[in-house]
Regions:
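Active-site-adjacent "subsite" loops/lids of carbohydrate-active enzymes
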Residues: 41-61, 134-206, 253-264
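Catalytic domains of carbohydrate-active enzymes, especially glycoside hydrolases
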Residues: 65-92, 206-210, 333-345, 401-405
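Aromatic-lined carbohydrate-binding/catalytic grooves of carbohydrate-active enzymes
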Residues: 79-113
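Aromatic-lined carbohydrate-recognition surfaces of secreted/lumenal glycan-active proteins
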Residues: 131-139, 213-220, 264-325, 375-387
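Substrate-binding cleft/loops of secretory-pathway carbohydrate-active enzymes
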Residues: 141-144, 222, 289, 293-353, ...
Length: 432
């Protein structure tokens, strides 16, 4: 049996020899996957808006061919959005409404249309890839100069227009004050707010547009409103009874200045809170119907001078009381920038350059950005009449130093033939 181990040895050596002929490959590391190339998000094109005022263009845009002609011109100039004003301060409407009277008469002009003014603008603008913001004045109700408008023909509004506290005439209804641009309804009244919300909701529901701009969404001035309804609302706001109203707020001096009363600062705070709370209601109504519609608001850039109108378009982060003697520490809580998508900053100033010059467009935009504090977008806006010869520079500053541009109004752009200059300003800003 000695041959058995020999055979086993033979096979063992054979197997070893076979294994030794194999090439042993070293393990290679897993290759690193290539880094994915993520395309950069394109920078959104800034909005460049041209305003079509209802009153100034009432006769011109009574013809469809005029509308399409100027939409073409706006597009070729570089605008990508228009603002269609559908309710001027007279208070009637250029859209189909169950709440407002159709606007057929303005000054000495009578126009009746058998077509929908707003719908035509929307359709033709969208054909040209122009976005549309619809603008409406909010608390306006007629013209004191001519006693024309809803406040004068409908006794529903008797006692609901603002009661002014004036230096020379005492308490008077704003309807009888021919120095005022419009007979304002009293913003504090629930029935007034509900009425305005109804026509806003109607607009948003029945028409498809891209933005809604609040205009004249404010008090008419520091003389209004001193009605019993406002006195009661103010007493509820501060939790105290007023013994001497309106002297508790201020007394007019013979030179037109004011002698401040006990509740002077709280009064401005209260009125701004009325407007702030109404803007919040508007936002809720709009977003409930069409969440994508952008809420916009136009106001003058000189915010320190319009507290008498109840317009605190700043962020709640900005404390006015540290800079202005008229502001309470709580005034900042009335800021409504955070309720807006876009603030249309009214830099309607003749000077363009000068970051340290409070009378310049550059300063107005920079201040707005500082006190809005990122709560919403800020667009620089221009009054074309102020820039007959230098609108290119004004357009350039607004577009390069803010998040968008609005030019008011097409009537001046037409009158002074500013199309080419505006286009040059847009192109200069977009070449940066």
């Amino acid at each position: 049996m000695k041959y058995i181990p020999s055979i086993l040895l033979f096979f063992f050596l054979l197997s070893f020899s076979s294994c030794s002929t194999k090439t042993v490959e070293s393990e290679l590391p897993e290759p690193n996957p290539p880094t994915p190339v993520i395309p950069e998000e394109p920078t959104p094109e800034k909005e460049k808006m041209l305003w079509f005022d209802a009153e100034a263009n009432f006769e011109r845009f009574s013809k469809k061919e005029n509308i399409t002609y100027y939409l073409d011109l706006a597009k070729s100039t570089g605008f990508n959005k228009i603002v269609v004003d559908v309710r001027p301060v007279q208070g009637d409407a250029l859209f189909k409404s169950s709440y407002l009277t159709p606007l057929t008469d303005l000054a000495d002009t009578h126009i009746e249309r058998d077509w929908d003014y707003l719908q035509f603008f929307i359709d033709e603008a969208h054909k040209r890839e122009l976005k549309v913001t619809v603008s409406a004045t909010i608390f306006t109700a007629g013209l004191p100069s001519s006693k024309n408008g809803m406040a004068y023909r409908d006794d529903t509004w008797d006692g609901k227009t603002c009661l002014e506290y004036t230096k020379d005439q005492g308490l008077i209804d704003i309807k009888d004050d021919k120095t005022k641009v419009s007979a304002f309804l009293n913003p504090v009244l629930p029935e007034v707010q509900d009425f305005c919300l109804n026509f806003i909701k109607e607009l948003v529901t029945n028409y498809n547009f891209d933005g809604f701009a609040l205009d004249y969404c404010r008090y008419p001035g520091d003389e209004s409103d001193f009605s019993e309804a406002t006195k009661t609302a103010f007493e509820q706001y501060i939790g105290k009874q007023l013994d001497r109203f309106p002297d508790d707020i201020f007394i007019w001096n013979t030179d037109g200045t004011k002698r401040t009363g006990t509740y002077y600062k709280k009064w401005w705070e209260f009125r701004s809170m009325v407007i702030r709370n109404f803007v919040e209601r508007v936002r809720t109504e709009i977003k409930n119907v069409k969440p994508d519609i952008q809420l916009e608001y136009w106001a003058a850039s000189w915010i320190h001078a319009i507290y008498g109108q109840g317009q605190n378009w700043a962020s709640t982060e900005y404390d006015f009381s540290k800079e202005y003697s008229w502001a309470s520490p709580e005034y900042k809580n009335t800021g409504f920038a955070g309720l807006l998508d876009t603030f249309l900053c009214g830099t309607y100033l003749t000077k363009i350059f000068g970051l340290n010059d409070p009378e310049s467009i550059e300063y107005g935009i920079a201040r707005a950005q500082r006190i809005v504090h990122g709560a919403c977008k800020v667009y620089g806006t221009l009054y074309a009449l102020n820039h007959k010869d230098n609108i290119a520079d004004a357009v350039y500053v607004c577009l390069s130093q803010s998040e968008g541009l609005m030019v008011f109004d097409i009537v001046q752009v037409i009158e002074f033939n500013q199309w080419a200059a505006i286009k040059e300003g847009i192109q200069r800003a977009e070449s940066l």
